[in-house]
Amino acid sequence: MNIRNARPEDLMNMQHCNLLCLPENYQMKYYFYHGLSWPQLSYIAEDENGKIVGYVLAKMEEDPDDVPHGHITSLAVKRSHRRLGLAQKLMDQASRAMIENFNAKYVSLHVRKSNRAALHLYSNTLNFQISEVEPKYYADGEDAYAMKRDLTQMADELRRHLELKEKGKHMVLAALENKAENKGNVLLSSGEACREEKGLAAEDSGGDSKDLSEVSETTESTDVKDSSEASDSAS
């Protein structure tokens, strides 16, 4: 199972998934509005064949009088792929993107009062809290729970993760620099050792030459002496 950022070519399949899963449906232009205005915030879940089995459609609320916050327009997972944690993964990805791209402080959504399964998911698994009841929010006149999830803790965790990542990067660079410095010292020591060996070899060679010269001179002197003695004896 793969979770990834939604692309424009995914929008029609996201709409198809919506029609299969939810009573709240949207025209195609509404999907394009989200995809083109906030391309970082919507995600899809796809199976091993690349088919979309779940999605989250998200946006930022454009309220200048409030702190930056996102809104989940629609979240759906096909019945065949439920209870796999996909809803939580999709929600977390969208929330993280809201923090990283828009510094969102919280994320909101609406859910039908009668949708107990979704209410349980949002409250118990995804850490949303009911902020108010909005009467007759849906087209059929049903009330909605307006819910919010505070993103402060997630933002702090992301910040710590980035700090640790940056610290780790500096440690790696320092280790590489230290390794390079040690390698340079080893090469320098090796070069000095080679020069010392060459010096010793040169000294040994000079000593050998001297010894050979002395031996040669001694031999020549002996030959001359022997020749002289032989000459005296003959006379």
From Swiss-Prot:
Residues with N6-acetyllysine modification: K136
Modified residues (Phosphoserine): S205, S209, S213, S216
GO molecular function, one term: ribosome binding
Gene Ontology CC terms: cytoplasm; cytosol; NatA complex; nucleolus; nucleus
Modification N-acetylmethionine occurs at: M1
Function text: Catalytic subunit of the N-terminal acetyltransferase A (NatA) complex which displays alpha (N-terminal) acetyltransferase activity. Acetylates amino termini that are devoid of initiator methionine. The alpha (N-terminal) acetyltransferase activity may be important for vascular, hematopoietic and neuronal growth and development. Without NAA15, displays epsilon (internal) acetyltransferase activity towards HIF1A, thereby promoting its degradation. Represses MYLK kinase activity by acetylation, and thus represses tumor cell migration.
Family from the record: Belongs to the acetyltransferase family. ARD1 subfamily.
The protein's name: N-alpha-acetyltransferase 10
Lineage, uppermost ranks: Eukaryota, Metazoa, Chordata, Craniata, Vertebrata
